Amino acid sequence: MPDLLLELRSEEIPARMQRRAAEDLKKLVTDALVERGFLYEGAKAFATPRRLALHVAGLPARGEAVREERRGPRVGAPEAAVQGFLKSAGLASLDQATTVTDPKKGEFYLAVIERPGRETLDVLAEILPGIIKSFPWPKSMRWGAASAQPGSLRWVRPLQSIVATFGPETETPEVVPFSVDGITAGMVTSGHRFLAPEPFEVRRFDDYVQALERADVILDADRRKDIILHDAKDLAFARGLDLVEDEGLLEEVAGLVERPVVLMGSFEERFLEIPAEAIRATIRANQKCFVLRKSGSDELAPAFVLVSNLIASDGGAAITAGNERVVRARLSDARFFWETDKATKLEDRLPKLDSIVFHEKLGTQGERVARIAALAAEIAPLVAADPALAERAARLAKADLVTEMVGEFPELQGLMGRKYAALQGEHDSVAAAIEEHYKPVGPSDRVPTDPVSIAVALADKLDTLVGFWAIDEKPTGSKDPYALRRAALGVIRAVIERSLRLSLASLLKGRFVSGSDERTADLLAFFADRLKVYLRDQGARHDLIDAVFALPGQDDLLMVVRRVEALGAFLATDDGKNLLAGYKRAANILRIEEKKDGRAYDEAPDAALAASGQPEERALAEALAAARQEASAAVAAEDFAGAMRALSRLRAPVDAFFEKVTVNADDPALRKNRLLLLNALRAATREVADFSRIEG
């Protein structure tokens, strides 16, 4: 079956945009084909610094004919409805429609629309120009004489050529006939910008890939990454060194070269006095190079790996020397930052925080630090931390924001603060908290273990959440510019993974200047939503989470989790499943009878009347009283498994009651009391969760 080959060659595409652009191209083209009824066997997109490419395999040469019956308005309908029908169906008059009789709805018009199958080549020529002209680049530009025209082509960098061919493997493919702003699709492309700039012709995908390889272009980004990684490791191994792997940098560098050539440079040992993280940040950020460490050690080596886009005649000596000069200059700057920063204590830097605006509505970093310090001291006893150390750590936590090193490399905030604090004789826990209070910064990041770090981390995140809730800057949909979901998840993970007992409502009380109760309740609801997401990711059932959160006062996240776990384990047993079924039956009966009677059956049942009734009625009343008391005591003791065991003993009497007892008895008093017994079952289960929220 025929294949499509599409290449869009331009000047350099920023590395960070390449993968997304390739996937966008694939989705836009394949979606447009499927929308028009053209299915395909497979599609794969590619990106290099100078081209996007797409291969769609197994397309039909021609689309199938389509016959559609479109129902119109009733015969005799208003003229406007008839004209709308004719227009939508592409008919000139009602003479071109047929009339169909429906036994229930009468006569109505029917249009039979037949569309002959179209040539795939024609369809491609129709859809590709629009996709190219409306391509969703994050940033784009216009260029040349055409840029003055309204609606002219926008591309990430000037588009230079388009390859678009279509045809089967056994025949010469055809060029898809279209052009965009004077660039006409053809079969001609070119290779590496410096190594093989001459144009050459390509026909189909296999030829295209091989021709690019001969022209020093490796089309597949993953293959470029693999070459870089393995060559870098081999080069390091040959020198007795290990590569410090960096997936983000590897992805970026693979997007900077079409023909990767791995080289190694070096710098003077004296620069190793700088913290390893600063060396790595300097070499990574400024030169896009990988650092190396001594084999079998965490200690950095005075060497680095660089990736060139050229096969140099001198073996890369000049390229390496040029990179070494720049790296030395950058490391000299980093060394100056390091020495300059060490000369000033973190505490002496605090006044500068008063001139840094955190948010225009939330004051300065200095004001924020004061709030975090007070909250950290309050949280400290709850997490077994020293309040004085927690307050001290919070006071210094943001001081490194005004250091030279963090000013140059913001990604080192916290880490450099820890190093400066340690050099200045601060307590180990204080120094650790300065770095760790930002954690966790992502789902794979670890939660702090030191109690002081935990106290400051919680205070920092809670202050952030309270502040943005106070000014009504909450996350909406997919937008979360201040990473408030991440902050809430950080609090949740710290509480759960470190088994912390905290009442969020108590910690939030009085934090809001106005509307305290409403804002606190709204923020607690946000925590509940985030906890649901977290627990779902851990495999918990969403309905069980809802069932626990439906109970009042659920602001102790650790207890919520333990209750959900116990409830899940209970409902996985036969006793749990049968009790849930019994609950559902009781709740359904109550709902029907309460609606019919216009009243709620929510008082306690008459024990004497139940005792004088049928044996199963008496047994259920006794079991409910005992189970509710036992479950309540177990919940109070935080023994949720024990509470579930208490409920499990209701299974047999509930089953027997429904089997032998008629709830809607003729005697009104007896009927009422039996409905109250069912309400007692509802109340007993509510000791542990709202069973009405549980599916099944």
Swiss-Prot record:
EC main group: ligase
Keywords: Aminoacyl-tRNA synthetase, ATP-binding, Cytoplasm, Ligase, Nucleotide-binding, Protein biosynthesis
Biological process (GO), any one: glycyl-tRNA aminoacylation
Amino-acid biosynthesis recorded as keyword: no
Gene3D superfamilies for this protein: Isoleucyl-tRNA Synthetase, Domain 1
Keyword Ribonucleoprotein belongs to the record: no
UniProt-listed Enzyme Commission number(s): 6.1.1.14
InterPro entries: DALR_anticod-bd, Gly-tRNA-synth_bsu, Gly-tRNA-synth_heterodimer
Enzymatic reactions: tRNA(Gly) + glycine + ATP = glycyl-tRNA(Gly) + AMP + diphosphate
Subcellular location: Cytoplasm
GO molecular-function terms, A-Z: arginine-tRNA ligase activity; ATP binding; glycine-tRNA ligase activity
A GO-annotated cellular component: cytosol
Domain of life: Bacteria
A Pfam entry, by short name: tRNA_synt_2f
Family membership noted in the UniProt record: Belongs to the class-II aminoacyl-tRNA synthetase family.
Complexes and interactors: Tetramer of two alpha and two beta subunits.
Name of protein: Glycine--tRNA ligase beta subunit
UniProt source species: Methylorubrum extorquens (strain CM4 / NCIMB 13688) (Methylobacterium extorquens)
Gene (name only): glyS
